[in-house]
Every structure is written in C-alpha cells, then in structure tokens.
Amino acid sequence: MEEDDHGGKHDALSALSQWLWSKPLGQHNADLDDDEEVTTGQEELFLPEEQAQARHLFSRKTISREVPADESRSGRVYQTAQHSLMEYSRPTMSIKSRWSFWSSSPKPLPKTPVPSLTSWTHTVNSTPFPQLSTSSGSQSPGKRRLQRLTSMERNGTTLPRTNSGSSTKAMVLHR
C-alpha cells in the first residue's frame, strides 16, 4: 500500500464528491441558510504477527439547504455523501474494498456508522477456509494433501479467537 498509489484513489473519491456537491437543489443563499457537517478520517493498523497492514480512509459530508416549499414541504433538503476505502494486505493476500453512498431527503436522515477498520480486519482474519474434500483410503502417488489445523489447548478444546491480530488457523501442505 504505497502512499502514491493511495493518493490517486483518494483523488478519485474527492472528484466524485465534488461532482455530487456541484448539483445544488433549489434557489438559496449559501452564506445565509446552509448548514454543513464534514467528517473525515484515516485509520492504519499493523499486525506484526501476520505481517499484515490495513488502511481505511473515510469521509462523510452532510449539507442542509433551504429550498422553496414546492421542492420540499419542510422547506429544507438534506444531502449526505459518504465514501470509504479499505485496504488489507499481507504476504499471501491483498483485499481492497470501496463504497460510496449518497442521499437526498426532505427530512434529516439518521447517521449511518462508518465501518471500523478493526472490525473489518477481524472479519478478514476469521474467514473460514473452504472445506476440503478428502477421500477415505489411500492417496494417489504424487498428489498433495492439504490439512486444516486449528490451535488447541492441552485438553483438546479450540482456543477462542481474539481481536489481537493473531490468527489461530493455518493450512499446511503435506507431501
């Protein structure tokens, strides 16, 4: 996740936001009757046990504008744009997720929560491995067999997963 590469993605999101906000509704005097709220943030996470890093950029902008009564019974319109860009990478995997949300309403909309990077990386780490089909009996010569491993305590019970960033599952290749 290079800084230069990430900057281009952020510029594309900014261009989309600027386009959305260049389409005002109704006749209004922005200096007198607009209310604006902007939230931006950046999260970064490094998990040394997994040699993984994650980054999350997000922004939310809400504008409340006065409009003629024929456009909105409340006399106001509320516009919201949200953008989120998440990246997760480690030596064997790279995941990118991007979403945008835009709404316009005559009533204030409830704020939707911005996704958290820590909850997203927990989802990535806890994604189960696909079930492997193994035949009972002998294995053909030259074929490899994958075995799913799970960390166990001494009494044979599976260790609970935590959000510490350490993974308790692994795949081992047997020849």
Curated annotation (Swiss-Prot):
Gene Ontology terms: biological process: transport of virus in host, cell to cell
Gene Ontology CC annotation, any one: host cell plasmodesma
InterPro entries: Luteo_VPG
Chain positions covered by the region annotation Disordered: 58-89, 103-175
Residue segments, region Homodimerization: 30-47
KW Phosphoprotein (keyword) present: yes
Subunit structure: Homodimer.
Main function: Together with movement protein P3a, facilitates long-distance movement of virions in host. Transports viral genome to neighboring plant cells directly through plasmosdesmata, without any budding. The movement protein allows efficient cell to cell propagation, by bypassing the host cell wall barrier. Binds ssRNA.
Family: Belongs to the polerovirus movement protein family.
The protein's name: Movement protein
Native species: Beet western yellows virus (isolate GB1) (BWYV)
